């Protein structure tokens, strides 16, 4: 047995499924998950010493690559001061100021420790602000594992939601309405039917958990207009795409201003940190100012804040996002070209440092289109690339990520490996 296999067998005795987050178990693609021992730059190494070009980047945070020397120095500098205080720090103020500067829609911000906490808290705040209960989300958009958000639509637009996870009470699910992503007509119908009941609409402006799917400008414009007309709070979940697709996030790309924004991943620099923020009049309803309670023992943890603040400073370097976008586009265009050479149905898309690979004839715009992907062929491709030392997301329904240290040589090596993988799929 390989060391990865031994560790996986051992892990399953004490950890449900052997992992602490389901996608890591390789259930979607089959085989043994890789247990990572260390990482550096664009690479990581597994328990058997195999090196991989890393295209998940800890599912988004590692925009600078692993163990960036300046981030490492920032963390080491504060370690000797204490790990956690449970009291305010100057660094919390500094990162809040930086976030508000970079994302103009955020007038005030509250730090938390995970994306799930950010979305859960933002929804509670929206409900407290509006005194309404109903929330609207979109099929295929993942907003963390809070009960209200683990809901899928029923058979018709106006039916109550049904939970898609065991353990979610129907009484909670019924307050969530799920609509089709990018469907403006369905959105308008929903607001016409019960717009004055909607506390909030939460959306990923660039979805990453049904692979990469972009919102259309018309869809986001309709969301902004309808939320304004009906007094509903528009929440952009930019936990994944915030600081990934542009310095100001997807809201900068689209020119749409949400009421609240959820952030995570990049703002922790690889440490557990997330945030939610937005309009001052809405944020004023949070305790201790208002009646909406939210708290966290490790919120604003000084070590996580040090890593996050240094990361936010470094990504402001001139040309950073142009370089990141160019390299990501080089990757997806190269993959599409070699797939075409092999006559394998395949499409790819990218925005900033995010990308999507689809074993379909065209780039999808909704969850229904994503599900048409040739999953067995993706799984075969994944393992061919893994054997060649390239680690893509172990699921046909996850976006990938490029860091600033994925240079042209690394991208070209990936494309060369893919040429052989696609050729074998065509055989």
From Swiss-Prot:
InterPro entries noted in UniProt: 4pyrrol_synth_GluAld_NH2Trfase (IPR004639), Aminotrans_3 (IPR005814), Aminotrans_3_PPA_site (IPR049704), PyrdxlP-dep_Trfase (IPR015424), PyrdxlP-dep_Trfase_major (IPR015421), PyrdxlP-dep_Trfase_small (IPR015422)
Subcellular location: Cytoplasm
Modified residues (N6-(pyridoxal phosphate)lysine): 265
One term under GO cellular component: cytoplasm
Source organism of the structure: Paraburkholderia phytofirmans (strain DSM 17436 / LMG 22146 / PsJN)
Cofactor(s), names only, from the UniProt record: pyridoxal 5'-phosphate
Enzyme type, top EC level: isomerase
Statement: the UniProt record of this protein carries the keyword Cell cycle: no
Pathway: Porphyrin-containing compound metabolism; protoporphyrin-IX biosynthesis; 5-aminolevulinate from L-glutamyl-tRNA(Glu): step 2/2
Family: Belongs to the class-III pyridoxal-phosphate-dependent aminotransferase family. HemL subfamily.
Molecular-function annotations in GO: glutamate-1-semialdehyde 2,1-aminomutase activity; pyridoxal phosphate binding; transaminase activity
EC annotation from Swiss-Prot or TrEMBL: 5.4.3.8
Protein name per UniProt: Glutamate-1-semialdehyde 2,1-aminomutase
């Amino acid at each position: 047995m390989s060391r990865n296999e031994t560790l996986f067998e051992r892990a399953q005795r004490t950890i449900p499924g052997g992992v602490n987050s389901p996608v890591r178990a390789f259930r979607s693609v089959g085989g043994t998950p890789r247990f990572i021992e260390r990482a550096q730059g664009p690479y990581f190494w597994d328990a058997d010493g195999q090196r991989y070009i890393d295209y998940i980047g800890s599912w988004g945070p590692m925009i600078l690559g692993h163990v960036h020397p300046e981030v490492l120095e920032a963390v080491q500098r504060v370690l000797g001061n204490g790990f956690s205080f449970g009291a305010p720090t100057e660094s919390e103020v500094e990162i809040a100021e930086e976030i508000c500067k970079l994302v103009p829609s955020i007038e005030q911000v509250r730090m938390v420790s995970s994306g799930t906490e950010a979305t859960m808290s933002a929804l509670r705040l929206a409900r407290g602000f509006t005194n309404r209960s109903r929330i609207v989300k979109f099929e295929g958009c993942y907003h963390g594992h809070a009960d209200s958000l683990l809901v899928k639509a029923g058979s018709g637009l106006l039916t109550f939601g049904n939970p898609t996870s065991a353990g979610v009470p129907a009484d909670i699910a019924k307050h969530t309405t799920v609509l089709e992503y990018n469907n403006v007509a369905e959105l308008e119908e929903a607001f016409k039917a019960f717009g004055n009941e909607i506390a909030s609409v939460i959306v990923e402006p660039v979805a990453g958990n049904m692979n990469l799917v972009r919102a259309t400008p018309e869809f986001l414009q309709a969301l902004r207009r309808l939320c304004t007309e009906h007094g509903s709070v528009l929440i952009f979940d930019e936990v994944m795409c915030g600081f990934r697709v542009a310095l100001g996030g997807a809201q900068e790309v689209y020119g749409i201003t949400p009421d609240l924004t959820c952030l995570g991943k990049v703002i922790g620099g690889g440490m557990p940190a997330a945030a939610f923020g937005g309009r001052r009049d809405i944020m004023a309803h949070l305790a201790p100012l208002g009646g909406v309670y939210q708290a966290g023992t490790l919120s604003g943890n000084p070590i996580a804040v040090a890593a996050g603040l240094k990361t936010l400073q470094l990504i402001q370097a001139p040309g950073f996002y142009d370089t990141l976008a160019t390299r990501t586009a080089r990757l997806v265009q190269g993959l599409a070209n070699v797939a075409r050479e092999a006559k394998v149905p395949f499409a790819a898309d990218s925005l900033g440092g995010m990308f999507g690979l689809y074993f379909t004839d065209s780039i999808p715009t909704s969850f229904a289109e994503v599900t048409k992907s040739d999953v067995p062929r993706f799984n075969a491709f994944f393992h061919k690339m893994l054997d060649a030392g390239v680690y893509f997301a172990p699921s046909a329904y996850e976006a990938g990520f490029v860091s600033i240290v994925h240079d042209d040589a690394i991208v070209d090596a990936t494309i060369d490996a893919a040429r052989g993988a696609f050729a074998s799929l065509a055989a």
